[in-house]
């Protein structure tokens, strides 16, 4: 007789980030019978593939932080058949609004991830405009064992009849059985430390990072 498989134990799992890795992670966890919450601080899925023409302002404490790392004319450096998920290939679509090239532009990758999200109903798992600000292992004396506490901040926009839209921030603490971090590596640039670059006489202007470039890239 074959051994009886162990019953699946459903866990409450947090996934941080709704980019490519976060989306497929959420899908696989739900397929295994777990309840999943995806935290995404942006307003849409896509992670590093979300393009904006905005850039960070000067390095001041009050500057606006822009998390996109794409320039306008960027194309993939891998063929599309190497970029898709195994059971959801990145196929060219017969649609005038899509990019059928083997090495497509960033917008096509973004649309592929949006298609993937719709196909598997992942959107219902995502809390948009919600930033995770702290994750820690819960101490046993708090009544839990091997659990994780997540503190998050969610921006909510409320519009009352006849009044302007108001924004409020809701802070929340929740307990999860497991946490999967899928935040990527391209949000904050790594600035090279060059001896003497803090001197005003070394360079006549500030450094410009590739992350802050949007146009005028040769293709």
Residue ranges and their predicted role:
Residues 9-11, 164-178:
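Core beta-strand elements of the Rossmann-like FAD/NAD(P) dinucleotide-binding domain
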Residues 21, 92-103, 114-115, 159, ...:
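Short interface patches used for recognition in eukaryotic signaling and trafficking proteins
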């Amino acid at each position: 007789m074959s051994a009886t498989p162990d019953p699946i134990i459903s866990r409450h799992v947090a996934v941080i980030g709704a980019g490519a890795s976060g989306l497929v992670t959420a899908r696989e966890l739900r397929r295994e019978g777990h309840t999943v919450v995806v935290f995404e601080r942006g307003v849409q899925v896509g992670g590093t593939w979300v393009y904006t023409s905005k850039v960070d302002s000067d390095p001041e404490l009050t500057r606006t932080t822009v998390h996109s790392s794409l320039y306008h004319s960027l194309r993939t450096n891998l063929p599309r058949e190497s970029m898709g998920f195994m059971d959801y290939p990145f196929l060219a679509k017969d649609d005038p609004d899509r990019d059928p090239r083997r090495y497509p532009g960033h917008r096509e990758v973004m649309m592929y991830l949006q298609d993937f999200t719709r196909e598997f109903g992942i959107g219902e798992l995502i809390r948009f405009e919600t930033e995770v600000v702290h994750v820690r292992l819960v101490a046993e004396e708090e009544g839990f064992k091997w659990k994780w506490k997540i503190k998050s901040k969610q921006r909510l926009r409320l519009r009352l009849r006849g009044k302007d839209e108001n924004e409020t921030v809701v802070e929340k603490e929740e307990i999860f059985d497991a946490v999967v971090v899928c935040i990527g590596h391209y949000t904050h640039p790594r600035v090279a430390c060059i001896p003497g670059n803090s001197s005003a006489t070394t360079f006549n202007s500030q450094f410009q990072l590739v992350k802050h470039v949007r146009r005028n890239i040769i293709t």
